[in-house]
Amino acid sequence: MLRFLNQCSRGRGAWLLMAFTALALEMVALWFQHVMLLKPCVLCIYERCALFGVMGAGLVGAIAPKTPLRYVAMVIWIYSAWRGLQLAYEHTMIQLHPSPFMTCDFMARFPDWLPLGKWLPQVFVASGDCAERQWSFLTLEMPQWLLGIFAAYLVVAIAVVIAQAFKPKKRDLFGR
């Protein structure tokens, strides 16, 4: 299996699949926001940014998957999945154990050189409360689903990094 993961990491298909899954999750988030009229909170916006990081890692890995650039993509992937996992956990704890002392910010804070809230306010402006439970599916709230999604991204990323030590088998058609 590790050889297979190594082989997949050297092809564009797996990287593009990862970018596509993150894009699909972003589209679902925008559907919830603009069609179902759910208000995203600050942690939702940060989790959305972590998903953009996973998508960016997929695109970076797809550029040149047979070169060392894929290691840069793996670092971005692991960092984004880890930060997303942390944010989803914090968001889940705020929802499961609401407290007036543990709240999220009123607006998302982005660096001055990357004012996403000004560039794309439809995507990056928060208007909801982190403790409010707006949506659930199969008894899980949205941050709990994101906890599982980011955990899956992180587990697969770690497996792919470990798989880099196992060289893929060379396919020899005639067995020489």
Swiss-Prot record:
Gene Ontology CC annotations of this record:
plasma membrane
Predominant localisation class: membrane
Q: Transmembrane stretches, by residue range? A: 15-31, 50-65, 72-89, 145-163
Query: Where does this polypeptide localize?
Result: Cell inner membrane
User: A GO term (biological process) for this protein?
Assistant: protein folding
UniProt topological domain (Cytoplasmic) ranges: 1-14, 66-71, 164-176
Q: What protein name does the entry list? A: Disulfide bond formation protein B
**Organism (species):** Salmonella typhimurium (strain LT2 / SGSC1412 / ATCC 700720)
